[in-house]
Curated annotation (Swiss-Prot):
This is Small ribosomal subunit protein uS19. The keyword Ribosomal protein applies. GO terms for cellular component: cytoplasm; small ribosomal subunit. The gene is rpsS. Belongs to the universal ribosomal protein uS19 family. HAMAP family: Ribosomal_uS19 (MF_00531). One of its GO terms (molecular function) is rRNA binding.
């Protein structure tokens, strides 16, 4: 269920303040954050935000297409290594007919 329009988007106060300060100074530094639920606003475009995925901080370069999405969408928390190989890779597992 989406957030009510009456409330407006959630952006962590400290994160928004850092981005606005960097915009006023014209700086481009990597900003670390644990706030995966913060919405990406148009002020974030062009900055790199390091979003925590539970283990490390994943650098996310914000583009115009990302505005309106949440930071956590771009830092996956699970690593998929593929399904088990087994007999299918070695050859046919069905017995041959004579």
């Amino acid at each position: 269920m989406p957030r009510s329009l009456k409330k407006g988007p959630f952006i962590e106060f400290k994160l928004e303040k850092r981005i606005l300060d960097m915009n006023s100074k014209g700086e481009k530094k990597v900003v670390k954050t644990w706030s995966r639920s913060s919405m990406i606003s148009p002020d974030f475009v062009g900055h790199t935000v390091a979003v925590h995925n539970g283990k490390t901080h994943v650098p996310v370069y914000v583009t115009e297409n990302m505005v309106g999405h949440k930071l956590g969408e771009f830092a996956p928390t699970r690593l998929f290594r593929g399904h088990a190989g087994g007999k299918a890779e070695k050859g046919g597992s069905a017995p041959r007919k004579k």
